[in-house]
Amino acid sequence: MKQNHNLSLRIIFTLCLLSVWSAWLSAQPKREVRAAWITTAYGLDWPHTRAISATSRERQKAELIKMLDKLKAANFNTILFQARTRGDVLYRSDIEPMNAILTGKVDGDPGYDPLAFAVEECHKRGMECHAWMVTLPLGNRKHVAALGKKSVTKTHPKLCVSYRKHYYLNAGHPETKDYLMSLVREVVQRYDVDGVHFDFLRYPDKARRFPDSYDYRKGGNGRSLAQWRRDNLTEILRHIYKEVKKIKPWVKVSTSPVGKYRDTSRYSSRGWNAFNAVYQDVQGWLGEGIQDQIYPMMYFRGNHFYPFALDWKEQNNGRQVIPGLGIYFLHPSEGNWSLDEIERQMNFIRAEGLDGEAHYRAAFLMEQDTQGLYDLLVDQYYTYPALQPAMPWLDAEAPTTPTGLHIERRQDGSVHLSWNASQDNDPDNTPMYVVYASDTYPVDITRPEHIVAQNVQGTTYTYTSILPWDNQKHFAVTAIDRYGNESAPCQGQP
């Protein structure tokens, strides 16, 4: 009872602080994840144009560029780009067909590789791009029929089951993890993704009659059905995590689990939680170290949000917890939440030291019906850039400090910077660079307002101030690796 009382007091105390010190709490940390999900299923966020000609292809690409430009302008640093939906993909795969949303035809060729394009455009803007992959659901009967012979239900029928008029990969089949890893391997080997992000790595809701009894009898080995199912999901994730780290150890492996792990000691999940309802042992995954990040889908408010966010934080095992915020509820047709609901949640996330937040979904950051959320982020919460949180459990050694920073002030008012390259302890991990600017010397790199560019690839950068009176006098450059380790600065001479 004392523990319950203490938890309640902590939540109440924190919420009181939020109301009194909201301006202070919105002070921006140098490192946090600022993510947006870009949903390609049904073209919800992108694309809205079908690529059936050279002109329409460029229009389709321009739609994504416009979205990325707006997210970059708001200092987002992470894009969760949906690269696999329901047994079809948005990249050139040898295993599954191209999604029809691109051209109007199953496995149609849009004339470019959407995932490669998304990665390239994100990196141009200093943002990470994670390949968001729906894992087990394969779609309803109509969708599967449309894929025809290219559907996994035809190419690997023994891995698939039908349940409530939908098809799923069977997590209880021992070869399912290998099939999923074959898809992940394509993505990680062929593309310069910063992460792979797994969605729907769970059983369907109310899955008591899910048709896996044969596999359970064969492989249950005395475990309860519930525990066997949890172990199946854990084994899939364990296998993928280990294999990804063999290929590119810096690639982040994450999931988007159900937003509440279990009932807390005081607050009920009302039957909808990861552990019991859909068999996700997420805290077990964190404890075992087979997750770098989790993005729990915390599309709730009040006591359905705050105590469960604390629960994730307290069980994180040093891994990154980035709550997913249901910003779509701000829309009048979705829930018409008031903007201060999301504002309180973001303040709470910073006050409690979580690792950032993700916004579901990108279109609701673009529309005006979300009650000014985008402007709020630009003006108060994401005014300055933020670096990615580091991953010391993978690598804690910073690159060497770049040297020889040369500053050339040009007649057009721009400043051209160049420097000598840094070196990293991992020869496959070429360092990137962060550029800082200030009107005082030496430049204080602990202050996020001094960041003018991050994840710069190459050893040159041209700085142009937006406003003439914003022109900075002094510059510094650091090297940063893909684990988030940052070197000491190379300061430009005053």
What is the predicted role of each segment?
Residues 463-486:
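Beta-strand-rich modules
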Residues 74-110:
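Aromatic-lined carbohydrate-binding/catalytic grooves of carbohydrate-active enzymes
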Residues 31, 39-62, 131, 136-190, ...:
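Active-site-adjacent "subsite" loops/lids of carbohydrate-active enzymes
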Residues 282-305, 319-393:
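Substrate-binding cleft of secreted/luminal carbohydrate-active enzymes
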Residues 372-428, 484-494:
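Pro/Thr/Ser/Gly-rich low-complexity, intrinsically disordered linker/stalk tracts
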Residues 67, 76-77, 84, 125, ...:
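Polysaccharide-binding and catalytic clefts of secreted carbohydrate-active enzymes
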Residues 38-40, 251-271, 308-344:
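Active-site clefts of carbohydrate-active enzymes
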Residues 422-448, 472:
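Solvent-exposed loop/turn segments flanking beta-strands in beta-repeat/beta-sandwich domains
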